[in-house]
Design a protein with these regions (language model features):
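Active-site proximal beta-strand in glycosyltransferases
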Residues: 3, 171, 188-215
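Membrane-proximal helix-turn-helix segments that form the acceptor-binding/catalytic region
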Residues: 158-168, 190, 202-203, 220-243
Length: 322
């Protein structure tokens, strides 16, 4: 059996909760062959792994979201081709941009077609006309040139994802929705394999929170970006055979974002019972008690309106993205 793990922005490039979980999971099944399809920003991190890869992880494929047209490993300047869509392809690409119901199979087939250039499509007349139609219907009160280039920026990483040649496997296990979920959904379309999605955090909500706080994107463009992530997650939920989350509240969020409830399994983080022996438990309780003693109120050191004298204990926190 061959399992393809699809990850974004984590394993094996950075240490963190999700990365550690992936590494442990692969090691826990030495009789299963794993391959890794990992999504990163650009080629600057190519092959820079911080984990020693397990022996049963046989191949690593990298997808770069901030990429350009490459041939035989080198960038070449070419005369731009006039790229035209079929009527069906144009209809579905319009539905994609307009946030309508999408026949994703047509989109998948379009980008896996031989000779399709992401640059030529984004800069071509069909995409221009689709964006202009969207602009006239929904965003006519903003500057068109800004809108056009923003839409090109939004769809560039998605189009690169859709052009990726997905390796064949028996099961695709995405550790998030987003671009990873798009790859998993496309793999299921072409290889007729099973698709499992395990969400440690709710990808769409995390991206939404980042965008709301971000300074690099303003006004209505925040909503356009948020809708982009929502439609990618909806695709993943629709195509997945099983979707897992860590707690009931996350399940409700997944349902709210369009995941069929019958697909969802709540799987809380496990506990290694070997570490919960009576001896270890007693030792842990003693440590907790000593820590509490540090913070206890010291007699004779209090005055009206003052705080108890305390030692400041700092904790190193690690944040794991997606």
């Amino acid at each position: 059996m061959k399992v393809c793990i699809v990850a974004e922005g984590c394993y094996p490039y950075v240490v963190g909760g999700v990365s550690g979980w992936i590494n442990s999971m692969i090691k826990s099944f030495p009789n299963i062959e794993f391959i890794l399809l990992t999504i990163v920003a650009n080629r600057s991190v190519r092959g820079k792994f911080v984990y020693e890869l397990p022996e049963n992880l046989t191949q690593v494929y990298e997808l770069y979201l901030e990429d350009c047209e490459w041939e035989e490993g080198e960038r070449e300047r070419k005369v731009r081709k006039r790229f035209h869509l079929s009527k069906k392809e144009r209809t579905e690409l319009t539905n994609l941009v307009m946030n309508r119901k999408i026949e994703w199979g047509v989109i998948f087939d379009l980008f896996q077609r031989k000779g399709v250039s992401v640059d030529d499509l984004l800069m071509g007349p069909d995409f221009f006309q689709i964006v202009r139609e969207c602009y006239k219907r929904q965003y006519a009160n903003i500057v068109f040139s800004d809108f056009l280039w923003t839409m090109r920026s939004i769809y560039l990483p998605l189009f690169w994802t859709l052009k990726m040649k997905v390796p064949q496997a028996d099961l695709y296990h995405c550790v998030a929705t987003g671009y990873a979920g798009v790859l998993g959904s496309m793999a299921k379309h072409f290889h007729n394999s099973s698709l499992l999605i395990s969400e440690h955090g709710i990808y769409t909500r995390e991206r939404e929170e980042e965008l709301i706080k971000a300074n690099w994107v303003k006004g209505v463009y925040k909503n356009i970006w948020i809708e982009q992530f929502k439609k990618m997650s909806l695709l993943a939920y629709q195509k997945a055979d099983t979707v897992t989350c860590l707690y009931e509240r996350a399940k409700l969020l997944q349902i709210d974002l369009g995941c069929p409830p019958e697909k969802i399994r709540v799987t809380p983080n496990g506990i290694n019972m070997a570490n919960i022996t009576s001896t270890n438990l007693l030792s842990n309780l003693r440590t907790i008690w000593r820590t509490l003693q540090i913070f206890r109120e010291k007699p004779g050191r209090m005055s009206s309106g003052s705080m108890p004298e305390q030692c400041c204990v700092s904790h190193r926190s690690r944040m794991s993205r997606r």
